[in-house]
Amino acid sequence: MSSSHHRRSRETSHAEMPIGRYTRLDEIGRGSFATVYQGVHTKSRTYVAIKSVNLSKLNKKLKENLSSEIHILKGLYHPHIVALIDCHETTSHIHLVMEYCALGDLSLFIKRRDTLGDHRYTQDMIAKYPNPRGGALNEVVVRHFLKQLASALKFLRDRNLIHRDIKPQNLLLCPSPSSYRSGVAQVVPFKGCDESFSPATGLESLPMLKIADFGFARSLPSTSLAETLCGSPLYMAPEILRYEKYDAKADLWSVGTVLYEMVVGKPPFRATNHVELLRKIEKGEDRIKFPEENPASEQIKSLIRMLLKRNPVERMNFSDFFDCDTITGPIPGLIADDAPSTSRRSSVAVNTSGSTSRPQSRTGSRTPTGMKREKDASYPGKKDDQVSYPAAHRPPTQRSDTPPASSPMRRMGSGDRATTSKETVTTTPRRPSVVSLATAPGRQELVDRNATAAVMERQRSRNTYAGVPQTEKQAEKTKEESERAAQEIAFERDYVLVEKRAVEVNAFADELAHSPRIQGGFPRNAYALSRRPGTQGSSTATATSPLATTGKAMQVASGRARADSTHTRQGSYERRYGQSPTSAISKALHMASGRLFGMGFSPPMTITKGGRSPPLGYNPFPAYPAAQGSLMVVGDGARTNVTLDEDAKTVQVIEECATRSDVVYGFAEVKYKQLIPLAPSVQTDPSGRANVPGGERDSTDLTDGGLTVDAVVTLSEEALVLYVKALSLLAKSMDIAGAWWSRKNRGEAFGESAMGRTDATSTLVSNRINNVVQWVRNRFNEVLEKAEFVRLKLIEGQKRLPPDHPSHPSNHSVGPSVGSGASTDVVVSSGVTAEKLMYDRALEMSRAAAINELTGEELSGCEIAYVTAIRMLEAVLEEEEVSRSEPGSGTDRGDARRDGDKAMLDGVRMEDRQVVIKSSIFIVTRKQSSFVLP
């Protein structure tokens, strides 16, 4: 929002760089995979934004996927979508030339609402519609932005496209169209089409909203991962946070969160990670509260509440949203100058007619047939660009009679094809089914219902479509579906290796949570709110819908135990193991952590720096809401069932394994939290200047968080190996629970329950195991995301090291461990192993606790330190247990080499290590048992 563009990005100024017909200027933003620059058209001197994507982070298939998506996006033009104008590829980057939005994004617009009256682009808006006290933006401005957002979403919806990442940071703002006409806005942007800066709805005297970055979430999944870990899931629908299958209604939840933030000034739910966020959403039970002093109208509040329904079935649908009075009706409270005129076109006409959509895909000829290009005197670069734009206000009947060229990844239905003049519908238009994504396949019942609703919506549409011969349409549809399926399969094979493991874990947790045996006699109404019985102590069970059971572990723990909570589980510190089946999860995690994260290990030779462990206030494992009393006193008291004793042992083994994983997770969190400030989240102010910490500091010496590159690499390596260790322990917990569940399904453990003598006991055991499984599932998903974030940080850090550094990629002696491309491989420095880090830290904690006990300092934390050290040492031994339990046929040669490396660590054989560790456990356990608080 600066009027002096020569001052833009003084700290990050780069030499001008020609990119096709454009010149790249200064940097205005930075992300995890791309850098955004301001650019200018070399002849027209109009401004563009150039997004330079680093190809080194994309493997071959992802590059092909991105190219297909780009071809589709080039054919989508709408006034409220940031247009992709051009694309240039070099050996190292893909440069995406996009429309330039001078006012920045909506999030900064809201944050700096108190200073908008001082800026030349927005001072007239604030003079007419001042921001209210107790609120964020004036309701006139809120409704104006909402209308434009709905217009863009309807355009996407008619083409069966889902954005999946609607948030204020992806809603960019341009100066009002009237400011361009009056000359107030001096920076003229390059037009993607004739009506790029002519609003389809809303007011011409207010800033114009455009959706950005749609369609890239799937092609560039590293962004969603980095953003997820840095705080952007604040706007994600709960079904996505629960790792459930979802449809386009996820966008409506995001619209509700954005609308709430425009009204209140902050998101409706705030948390530091997606696990805590989901817990808060579930705890809220659809009760959306507004500050008492907030002046928002009841109509706006009601719309927000209908959009922010946890259950997508109960959420407002697209038809109702597009037809509601807030979207279709006039904006109340307008001043006389902004009163609507009869000549203004309606948003619905623009959305459904597609007059702003380029009628021909750029994959074919750049000049559409059957349509003359109209000259635009205000657009001098048009002839040189050889790009066709639709005529302004062109009615639907003037479309080209030549269908657009087909694209391999084209997502448009038959209704989106060009029509012949003045022809009407001859066949019922049908929207293609929702695209099943690699990260979230489409849920069948929602897909079917969605398709039915789409037909009804099309019948009510004002649009007219040409009839397409049935045989031709069917053949083309079959070809498109087969090509799209091939693309989906190839994409999943190359990228979503981790996701498949998460799917297995989530599938078992879903099965257990929805089983009638687990639910017992509890109500099974699909939409009724039910409360967990038997809460203990002060724990409050959260009322949730059974459909949201996949996230019920949020009720159990938020992932971080409170320092003031009491660890009530009195499990023995002796090692008890159940028979762990060799499931796909355990096998995959043990066989190749590298297969999950692209990791290869150098032979361990020397030990690098260790790290600080969790603080003494860290509680290893959260208490469950179900009663934790003795299982032996529940039932009829007549006799004890042998299978009941086995169930009790199973519960204890699962809990102890989960506890060990939680201790390792806590250790990894210490490393991870030191990397969080390094997340690529450089923000730009409304003027477009990049806020780069450190000014002109050499980025190779210090990172944004003040850590050296060496420190970043060390922390990333240690966090990564610890997260992988935590995953293996979590997978083992799931395996033990899976074996128990298999026995239950075979009837081996339900012989007595049919007679009614152990129903209460079986229900208690089942609920207790279900609680652990749900907790493990959510922790597993969280660790997967954090491990991927750390992996990317490690790759980035290693590339920034000096070329002669041993950890620089050019000096790695171990070959790639994953066949998806060298860009995804990671090699950890010699000597960095989770077992060594854990062993050193356990001894450090126990020694510190012993000293504190002798000196009488911090006695309250001594027992916690002893218990944590014991669990960490037991987790070290867990590696040997897993290694011996896995058959040799299930491992590959790379794992055999790693096992051989582990047989000798620092000159100590495996058997000797076990003796040393077990001796340490015995000593610490004895010390802990003798510890008594004064």
Curated annotation (Swiss-Prot):
Annotated family: Belongs to the protein kinase superfamily. Ser/Thr protein kinase family. APG1/unc-51/ULK1 subfamily.
InterPro entries the UniProt entry points to: Atg1-like, ATG1-like_MIT2, Atg1-like_tMIT, Kinase-like_dom_sf, Prot_kinase_dom, Protein_kinase_ATP_BS, Ser/Thr_kinase_AS
Biased composition (Basic and acidic residues): 371-386, 561-577
Region (Disordered): 335-432, 462-481, 531-580, 684-703, 800-822, 878-900
Descriptive protein name: Serine/threonine-protein kinase atg1
Domain Protein kinase: 22-328
GO CC term, one of those recorded: vacuole-isolation membrane contact site
Keywords: ATP-binding, Autophagy, Cytoplasm, Kinase, Membrane, Nucleotide-binding, Protein transport, Serine/threonine-protein kinase, Transferase, Transport
Catalytically driven reaction(s): L-seryl-[protein] + ATP = O-phospho-L-seryl-[protein] + ADP + H(+); L-threonyl-[protein] + ATP = O-phospho-L-threonyl-[protein] + ADP + H(+)
UniProt main location, coarse: cytoplasm
Gene3D superfamilies: Phosphorylase Kinase, domain 1, Transferase(Phosphotransferase) domain 1
Quaternary structure and interacting proteins, as annotated: Homodimer. Forms a ternary complex with ATG13 and ATG17.
This protein's record includes keyword RNA-binding: no
Organism whose genome encodes this protein: Aspergillus oryzae (strain ATCC 42149 / RIB 40)
Compartments, record wording: Cytoplasm; Preautophagosomal structure membrane
Membrane topology: Peripheral membrane protein
Ligand binding (ATP): 28-36, 51
Catalytic residues of the enzyme: 165
UniProt biased composition (Polar residues): 340-368
Biased composition (Low complexity): 538-550
Protein role: Serine/threonine protein kinase involved in the cytoplasm to vacuole transport (Cvt) and found to be essential in autophagy, where it is required for the formation of autophagosomes. Involved in the clearance of protein aggregates which cannot be efficiently cleared by the proteasome. Required for selective autophagic degradation of the nucleus (nucleophagy) as well as for mitophagy which contributes to regulate mitochondrial quantity and quality by eliminating the mitochondria to a basal level to fulfill cellular energy requirements and preventing excess ROS production.
Any one GO MF annotation of this record: protein serine kinase activity
